[in-house]
Amino acid sequence: MAHTTKVNGSASGKAGDILSGDQDKEQKDPYFVETPYGYQLDLDFLKYVDDIQKGNTIKRLNIQKRRKPSVPCPEPRTTSGQQGIWTSTESLSSSNSDDNKQCPNFLIARSQVTSTPISKPPPPLETSLPFLTIPENRQLPPPSPQLPKHNLHVTKTLMETRRRLEQERATMQMTPGEFRRPRLASFGGMGTTSSLPSFVGSGNHNPAKHQLQNGYQGNGDYGSYAPAAPTTSSMGSSIRHSPLSSGISTPVTNVSPMHLQHIREQMAIALKRLKELEEQVRTIPVLQVKISVLQEEKRQLVSQLKNQRAASQINVCGVRKRSYSAGNASQLEQLSRARRSGGELYIDYEEEEMETVEQSTQRIKEFRQLTADMQALEQKIQDSSCEASSELRENGECRSVAVGAEENMNDIVVYHRGSRSCKDAAVGTLVEMRNCGVSVTEAMLGVMTEADKEIELQQQTIESLKEKIYRLEVQLRETTHDREMTKLKQELQAAGSRKKVDKATMAQPLVFSKVVEAVVQTRDQMVGSHMDLVDTCVGTSVETNSVGISCQPECKNKVVGPELPMNWWIVKERVEMHDRCAGRSVEMCDKSVSVEVSVCETGSNTEESVNDLTLLKTNLNLKEVRSIGCGDCSVDVTVCSPKECASRGVNTEAVSQVEAAVMAVPRTADQDTSTDLEQVHQFTNTETATLIESCTNTCLSTLDKQTSTQTVETRTVAVGEGRVKDINSSTKTRSIGVGTLLSGHSGFDRPSAVKTKESGVGQININDNYLVGLKMRTIACGPPQLTVGLTASRRSVGVGDDPVGESLENPQPQAPLGMMTGLDHYIERIQKLLAEQQTLLAENYSELAEAFGEPHSQMGSLNSQLISTLSSINSVMKSASTEELRNPDFQKTSLGKITGNYLGYTCKCGGLQSGSPLSSQTSQPEQEVGTSEGKPISSLDAFPTQEGTLSPVNLTDDQIAAGLYACTNNESTLKSIMKKKDGNKDSNGAKKNLQFVGINGGYETTSSDDSSSDESSSSESDDECDVIEYPLEEEEEEEDEDTRGMAEGHHAVNIEGLKSARVEDEMQVQECEPEKVEIRERYELSEKMLSACNLLKNTINDPKALTSKDMRFCLNTLQHEWFRVSSQKSAIPAMVGDYIAAFEAISPDVLRYVINLADGNGNTALHYSVSHSNFEIVKLLLDADVCNVDHQNKAGYTPIMLAALAAVEAEKDMRIVEELFGCGDVNAKASQAGQTALMLAVSHGRIDMVKGLLACGADVNIQDDEGSTALMCASEHGHVEIVKLLLAQPGCNGHLEDNDGSTALSIALEAGHKDIAVLLYAHVNFAKAQSPGTPRLGRKTSPGPTHRGSFD
């Protein structure tokens, strides 16, 4: 198959990349005998000539080498793989024509630009238009091998070919429509994908295989275009027999007659096409003249635009002026407008800015349209010229190969040779023409300037706005049409109702009009005179009167003559008519009532006549005033005639009217009422069920999430004061206040005032931080006494705050008795716990036994430290008074020795609640640090003074708490090891619980407070503090809730001197409400996982990128980590939830991809979670709303099928399973046996799952691959209750048979389940009559869409 070439400067990237310098050399010398040619038709012809001649072509090939330097070969810098291409044109050209050999490739390539599309994505065809400008860049191939002389055998063959071509020409001309393609695929080296119907199927050869055999492998272009020709012509197919002799000096002679026949057929078609192309060539000069005229017109218009268009015009519309070869954008816009509107070039510079923008946008659009038209016209001209030149060459080649030297062909060839030489010469001319045409738009040259980009952007915006406008217009038209249709329907209904009412009205006036024969005329006259009154007062009365007027004249004409007989006869007819039109007569009565009321409103003069009207309808005697139509006529002397008329028809008409109306009203009301009720019931059932079932689950899940989050935050913040409502804001406010105090370096009075203002809760909010700590320190050991005065003690004692100080009542700095008694008790207890711990560690770990060699000496040192610390604190407590506590100087002097070591630890963690004031003070200079310590301690005196007396146990707790955290009074400093329960996520991984480590274990704490003080604590002292803290926390958890509330404050105040306030707050939360507050660690993705997720996010929409090596590594990492976290039996729901949140934060697409990852068996995390009964994880996965619930593993099972087999114990788990059923297809079949989830649940006796599946719409009658149903499975396994449940379903079919012809009844009998057989027998035989209607009943009474039966 000939190869398609592109002559533009850009080619496909792949081919361009492959063509390196070495390959260029190969393309320069591809025509030696030893080298494969790579172009099939050329080889075939060479083989054909060699077979006939049986000669040797080595000498001619040497001649090719000598002649090659004469061919113009520029630098191999052309970007595509076209540079060294020698198409198969030469093999079909005459062996004696040298002009075919000099530059055949370029002309043919020009024609190939317009060939059919190529499979490998080339650059757009617009970019290939300037191909005429690069003839010098083409490397022209050497001439094809030629014969030095014709022998007799060749001449005979060519003559025979000529004869057969002439014979078949008539046949070919019979169906000219089949050969409408402009070029042939295999003739003349065109390389197109022409699919000529009559030549498609000859020679069943594989194109890909042929490429490998015959294609030039060194060239990336040739193989890349093979897929573009799936339907090649027969010539190209037959030529594929020939690659065997492509590079052999002695060719293989295996040419078949079919091969020759194909060549003849191709040449016949080419000759026919040549004539068509000659006709097309004649139109080229005309088109060129048109182009020149258009270009001249363009230049004139551009000059006009330059004179008329102002520079500010473009600035308003936001588009810069663009420079084109034929003028700027604004000029071209105006040019297009001039062509369309006949030269309207005037621009109103005084228009509003908005209109200017719209005009400029429209001009840009018109400019683009003009550019496209010009481009299409030039493309058409160039294509026609290219086709003509190439086809001339093709036909010449055809003549030279197959026809020989007959006169007709020679004449044609001479003619075409001349045109072809003209084409060669005209290449330069075309180059100039192309340059002129290309100058219209730079985009045609492949150059995208910034101006073009802006134009494109505006064009896209215009197009999008057009589409929106179009859509809105369509919607508007549809809406308008619907409204008009609705109005027409309403008018039709109203007209119909009016017709009906008029008919009924016609009957009524017949009775009345007889009495008012003469009055009608008078009434007409009076209506005209009284129209003003009616219009001014009430508009409705006018309409009613007009209706009455129209009806009465008709009645008058009928009843003028015989009055009495007509009255009687009409009464009888009226009875029948009232039966029919009962409802309508009722409406008429209503209308008449409204008429009367309106008449009353019209004028006070006519009230007498109005009363007469009402009486006239109810009582016949008042028909004397029957001038109803003339209610206004009572003023005029027309009373005489109505009286006469009234005496005639009074009795009969009134009775008939009253009876008819009474009969009609009940019937109408009953019918309407029943209809309305039915409709209401139908709509109510459907809407209510749907809304309740669909919306309830969503709301509940949302509330649960929000509630848990808010509750944790609220409790954490509000523990100290008990003020739950003010907690959220006060927490953050306190921490801010701490920062302010730290920077201010102020004393006690100032910080407390700042606290009070910023917290927004009042003075008590900040002071409670101190008071809670003080109170709780004091209260921790004596629950009963301190709980009573809890509130008073909190608010009464204040440190450095004047408002709080005012509330103190008679402070008595008396120290409670028996402090040391309680202290000794707790010291002993601590010693015991330490000894027990060392003993256990030494027993369990032999390597630690040596480290614990002298436990008693260590205990003694620890004991001495505790006692010294506590005694110093005790002395301060005894000596300090409330006034001294408020005095910063006193605290600095008295407690300076105790503090000093705690500065670094206190100021590291910013406190949230009560600890914030203390932390703010402890971060001040050392002398103020002493005050922060002394403040809680000395305030103990003020606190118990209000209580009167404190129990020794309380004081002991206080001392112990102070001693635990003040044990660094000597040379060593203790680091606080208490960790936050939730783990500060931004800190360096604080532990979740307290560390319990042996004294000499050498454990290094990981608390977030890195010591900033000058002294550093030894690991031994750290461990000691750990050991002390752990049992104390255990002990306090055993106390009741009130004691916990106090002990929490007791710990907090002591910790404030040594630790961060954040730690104190979380201790309060932990101890005060341990059963409600849940504080846990947050699991975060590792750096490796984060990088993998980010890489997946960037390439998730690119299938090719997902298959790269790096992406496979990242996906393996994600899969391994995800299944490790989510798919194990021991998976942690909290961890899974954190991972899901992390994936969703990165990208919803990443979350969807990761959650639906499947392992080698096709199982996802949802499969594993259901199999392991980890229903909390199932809930998390379902809440993510990205799970593919219907995903089947390799065994064909979905998570719903696995859930049908799971064991569910808790009610909440069952709800999760039901939610899973509702999210997927409960009727999906397994790929292996075709079983559904209902069959699996029935087979394993899971009745709860059966109920859930049936509630979610599972079909009872689905059959698996063996024909079995769920009822058959239940009958076979003997599940009686399940059988009853299935039979109770609407539409359960007990007659179904499996592939063996067995029914559920026969299966139950074979298995020996007699009770089930009885049930089935009764259902099959006694429920036959009801079974057809059962599905309908189920459809009517179904409570909602999720509970419908299978046939609903």
Curated annotation (Swiss-Prot):
Keyword presence, Nucleus: yes
Motif Nuclear export signal 3 (NES 3): where in chain: 613-622
Motif Nuclear localization signal 2 (NLS 2): where in chain: 979-992
ANK repeats: 1109-1146, 1161-1191, 1195-1228, 1233-1262, 1266-1298, 1300-1329
Annotated region (Disordered), positions in chain: 1-31, 63-103, 914-951, 979-1026, 1331-1352
Signal peptide feature range: none
Region ranges (Interaction with KIF21A): 1073-1352
Compositionally skewed regions (Basic and acidic residues) per UniProt: 22-31, 979-989
Keyword list, A-Z: ANK repeat, Cell membrane, Cell projection, Coiled coil, Cytoplasm, Membrane, Nucleus, Phosphoprotein, Repeat, Transcription, Transcription regulation, Tumor suppressor
Annotated Low complexity bias: 87-97, 914-925, 1008-1019
Residues with Phosphoserine modification: 186, 325
Effect of residue 454 to K: Found in a patient with nephrotic syndrome; uncertain significance; no effect on protein localization
Topology term for the membrane: Peripheral membrane protein
One Pfam match: Ank_2
Location of this chain's protein in the cell: Cytoplasm, Cell cortex; Cell projection, Ruffle membrane; Cytoplasm; Nucleus
Effect annotated for changing residue 1197 to L: Very weak binding affinity for KIF21A
Tissue: Widely expressed. Isoform 1 is predominantly expressed in heart and kidney. Isoform 2 probably is widely expressed at basic levels.
Gene Ontology terms: biological process: actin cytoskeleton organization; cell population proliferation; cortical microtubule organization; negative regulation of actin filament polymerization; negative regulation of cell migration; negative regulation of insulin receptor signaling pathway; negative regulation of lamellipodium morphogenesis; negative regulation of neuron projection development
UniProt-listed PROSITE patterns: ANK_REP_REGION, ANK_REPEAT
Effect of residue 1298 to A: 15-fold decrease in binding to KIF21A
Molecular-function annotations in GO: beta-catenin binding; protein-macromolecule adaptor activity
Outcome following mutation: residue 1197 to A: 4.5-fold decrease in binding to KIF21A
Assembly description: Part of a cortical microtubule stabilization complex (CMSC) composed of KANK1, PPFIA1, PPFIBP1, ERC1/ELKS, PHLDB2/LL5beta, CLASPs, KIF21A and possibly additional interactors; within CMSCs KANK1 and PHLDB2/LL5beta seem to be the core components for recruiting microtubule-binding proteins KIF21A and CLASPs, whereas PPFIA1, PPFIBP1 and ERC1/ELKS serve as scaffolds for protein clustering. Interacts (via KN motif) with TLN1 (via R7 domain); this mediates CMSC clustering around focal adhesions. Interacts (via CC1 domain, residues 244-339) with PPFIBP1.
Role of this protein: Adapter protein that links structural and signaling protein complexes positioned to guide microtubule and actin cytoskeleton dynamics during cell morphogenesis. At focal adhesions (FAs) rims, organizes cortical microtubule stabilizing complexes (CMSCs) and directly interacts with major FA component TLN1, forming macromolecular assemblies positioned to control microtubule-actin crosstalk at the cell edge. Recruits KIF21A in CMSCs at axonal growth cones and regulates axon guidance by suppressing microtubule growth without inducing microtubule disassembly once it reaches the cell cortex.
Disease field: Cerebral palsy, spastic quadriplegic 2: A non-progressive disorder of movement and/or posture resulting from defects in the developing central nervous system. Affected individuals manifest congenital hypotonia evolving over the first year to spastic quadriplegia with accompanying transient nystagmus and varying degrees of intellectual disability. Neuroimaging shows brain atrophy and ventriculomegaly.
Protein name: KN motif and ankyrin repeat domain-containing protein 1
